[in-house]
Swiss-Prot record:
It comes from Chromohalobacter salexigens (strain ATCC BAA-138 / DSM 3043 / CIP 106854 / NCIMB 13768 / 1H11). Its main location: cytoplasm. The keyword NADP applies. SUPFAM superfamilies: 6-phosphogluconate dehydrogenase C-terminal domain-like (SSF48179), NAD(P)-binding Rossmann-fold domains (SSF51735). The keyword Oxidoreductase applies. The active site is at residue 193. Keywords: Cytoplasm, Lipid biosynthesis, Lipid metabolism, NAD, NADP, Nucleotide-binding, Oxidoreductase, Phospholipid biosynthesis, Phospholipid metabolism. This is Glycerol-3-phosphate dehydrogenase [NAD(P)+]. HAMAP family: NAD_Glyc3P_dehydrog. Its EC number is 1.1.1.94.
Length: 356
């Protein structure tokens, strides 16, 4: 008898890939998960848990882990790629011989490739040329999903079929999937917020108050949207789950990897010590450098990203950098309502302002 259940493939054995695999299995799909570590493969299949990335949380027994890429991808209707950005291209190329144009390919990776400043869905598009490509992003802490805490996410794609199929595959009583057609904006939001989570962790370690945290998050949102809109994204995307939603959870939760790196740095640990203690990839560290370079090339004002770069890579003390940022010229709150240039022009109207 033929098994009519949809087949889902998940590439990646980390915390989020494992959580997505378990959701799809909860919804009745046949789920195969590809990963490299033989010991972890055996543990998922035998004990139905991932002790390295999601300790103490049960995985749906229907999830079958394997190191055989061809077998995992065989007959899969939906393919979720949950691989760190540094290895994303390599894994996509490894999978390419067994991918088909009819498959729906969805990136869950919140990062940027250094070569060409490419987002993960752009890599999928370039490498495959397939029509059904999407991005899954939002305020999604994997450990909370694994505990079946009520969670919402965004599937972003130009393709209506991709959006609909992902909503059907993952939507359930504890995981709600909203749709967007701004793939670029949703993906940029997921990558950019990691920068500011590091800054939020530093601020917490330095004992800064709630006013400071609120200021940091709202100015981070302004900076994220300024950068993304300059590159072609829709500014309204950033008032949704993939913008302010993801920013809030990543800057507030001690479960956030980037927040934890920032907190360690705020306690005067070196970057190497902070990343080593984490034991997982914190995408924000690499993203800071890439975004800072891109912003300079495109002449986009990014004071928080610039300041964080100085702390991470040039050894400037975090408290000193915060003081320097507070001394910068005051500008517009919401630039899509009142531009920075209009604020600066208005200062010329003040008594005693110099003629220019």
């Amino acid at each position: 008898m033929t098994d009519e259940r949809p087949k889902v493939a998940v590439l990646g054995g980390g915390s989020f890939g494992t959580a997505i695999a378990s959701i799809a299995a909860d919804n009745g799909a046949r789920v195969n998960q590809w990963l490299r570590d033989p010991a972890l493969i055996e543990q998922i299949n035998r004990e139905h848990r991932n002790a390295r990335y999601l300790p103490d949380y049960a995985i749906n027994p229907a999830v079958v882990a394997s190191g055989d890429m061809q077998e995992v991808l065989r007959d899969a209707e939906l393919v979720f790629i949950a691989i760190p950005s540094s290895a994303f291209l390599t894994v996509v190329r490894q999978a390419l011989p067994w991918l088909k144009p009819t498959q729906i390919l969805v990136s869950t990776t919140k990062g940027i490739q250094e070569d060409g400043f490419k987002l993960m869905s752009q890599i999928l598009e370039e490498e495959t040329g397939f029509p059904h490509i999407g991005v899954l992003s939002g305020p999604n802490l994997a450990s909370e999903i694994a505990q079946k805490h009520l969670t919402a996410t965004v599937i972003a794609s130009d393709d209506p079929l991709t959006r609909a199929r992902v909503q059907s595959a993952l939507g359930c009583d504890y995981f709600r999937v909203y749709a967007s057609n701004d793939r670029y904006g949703v993906e940029l939001g997921g990558a950019l917020k990691n920068i500011y989570a590091i800054a939020a962790g530093m601020a917490a370690a330095l004992g800064m108050g709630e006013n400071t945290r609120s200021m940091l998050m709202t100015r981070a949102l302004a900076e994220m949207s300024r950068f993304a809109v300059a590159l072609g994204a829709n500014p309204l995307t950033f008032i949704g789950l993939a913008g302010v939603g993801d920013l809030i959870v990543t800057c507030s939760s001690k479960l956030s990897r980037n927040y934890r790196v920032g907190f360690a740095l705020g306690e005067d640990k070196t970057l190497e010590e902070a990343v080593t203690a984490l034991g997982q990839v914190a995408e924000g560290v690499n993203t800071v450098s890439l975004v800072r370079e891109k912003a300079r090339r495109e002449h986009i004002y990014m004071p928080l990203a610039e300041g964080l770069y100085q702390v991470l890579f040039n050894g400037v003390p975090a408290r000193q950098m915060a003081q320097m940022l507070m001394q910068q010229e005051q500008s517009s709150d919401v630039e899509f309502i009142l531009s920075r240039q209009d604020v600066f022009e208005a200062r010329r109207l003040e008594p005693g302002a110099e003629e220019t």
